Amino acid sequence: MKNVLKYLLLALIAVSQLFACGGSDDEKAPADNFDVQFTVPGSVDVTEGGECTFAVSGGGRKSPLTTDTFILESDAGISYVCPIVNTTSDSFTVRLADGCETGYYKVFVKRDARKKSFGRIYINIVEDIDFKPDAGTTVYGIVSSAGVGVENVVVSDGAEVTVTNEKGIYQLKSAKKWGYVFISVPSGYEVPSVGVLPQFHRALKNSADVVERADFKLEKVDGQDSYKIFMLGDMHLANRTGDLGQFAQFTSDLTDYMTRHKGEKMYALTLGDMTWDLYWYSNSYYFPQYLNTVNSQIKNLQIFHTMGNHDNDFQTRSDYDAAVKYVDQICPTYYSFNIGKVHYVVMDDIDCSSYDGSTSRNYVKSLSAEQLDWLAKDLSHVDKTTPVVVAMHAQVFYPTTSGFKIDHDPVNTQRLFDILDGYTVRFVTGHTHKLFNVTPDAPIVDGHNFREYNSGSVCASWWWSGNLTPGIHIGTDGTPGGYGIWDVTGTDFQCLYKSTGWPEEYQFQIGRAHV
């Protein structure tokens, strides 16, 4: 009897181990063990509901089966099932599912219960424009309004500059250094916005040897013969010294002003230092938080942006790397646009080439040769009779005891002046947290028809005065924190500085001394 029980016990143990081993094998079996491998490009251009083909890669690998399921999963977690319509040993083709929009997607192939991941792709939904790019072209696209191509729109990658043809199509032999392409928004049009940011540029997704397409949409608008543009000097938002609460007072003031002038065209242009690099890491406040703050408080206003020294990443070691976060999340560091009869140019005059990754932030006030080369090409499409507004963060001139001096790299500044010679130019700058103007009759201007408006700051004294003495919000020269308001009618400019919390008429105050 004991022997029988012994054998039964051994048999049960053996059977249990057999089932345990079988279950373990199933649990450890990879969910993606079917033999499919293909190349996922950085992006694909495809018409709505159109087809796209993928190359099969890997020695001995195979295409998916037509009975497999090809899935695109959006960043929002929505899955789109795209039918596999054809397969060969070298490639396979899928038809884009209805509802797929331009954007990033995770790529999966599912076979039975097994699901295999293949990475991430950018799906670019485009119109069929029946156009084959020239040899050497790496970026092309169409600029259109209401489904019709717009001719003579200036397009650039920051180095090469071209214009759209009669069908609104452009092409560039771009090295894709900056990874974007932008248009100079033409007069009489606007681009769509994401929050306050006008969408005049497109990020490129592929390497320089891959041809890709980037399209732009324009909306025709009226009312640009007379409009207002707000000049927003240094903000220095960093979530410190009560800055966010004080900033809300500024946005409330701006909103009230816009409400009183409802029906008029309005735009805005920052003058740099929207953020404060020292607090990007310690306070976790930089461009995403800045945009959240601004977008929650300012509505129905396109804000073009200028880069300041504090908008560069100090934990880098080159001018290019210092600007990467700004370019990725705000816009190009230099570009142009048109409103009405005025051509606006935004430039980056903070050179961070000597950054060493520390808080020393050894920048110089200078315009790169690359920017100046681009500017000359950009202005070749602008008539000399067109007024030009050049926005930069750091001042071109600076007051001295006897007048003004050039406060920039002298060599590149002289080249800037040479390029702008013959134009009526208004420089608008920030950086100093002060107010001063330079007019064409100043000797330092040397006969050019140049003006400079150093346009104060939103934050006044880096928000310190309002934090220490609530209700007193002044800069180092006594100017209250505020913003510029330019009324532009045709080619005529009326420029006003508005102090936050005060009416436009409040322009000067003298304190009486107590003796």
Predicted regions and their residues:
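Hydrophobic beta-strand segments
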Residues: 13, 70, 153-157, 181
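Bacterial Sec-dependent N-terminal signal peptides
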Residues: 15-44, 114-135
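Immunoglobulin-like IPT/TIG beta-sandwich domains and homologous Ig-like subdomains
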Residues: 40, 46-116, 158-160
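N-terminal active-site segment of His-dependent metallophosphoesterases
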Residues: 130-138, 145, 188-281
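Short, acidic Ser/Thr/Gly-rich low-complexity loop/linker segments typical of extracellular
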Residues: 153-174
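Extended active-site neighborhood of metal-dependent phosphoesterases/phosphodiesterases
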Residues: 186-205, 210-212, 280-382, 407, ...
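Short acidic, glycine-rich surface-loop motifs adjacent to enzyme active sites
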Residues: 379-404
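Conserved small/polar residues in nucleotide/adenosyl-binding loops
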Residues: 513-515
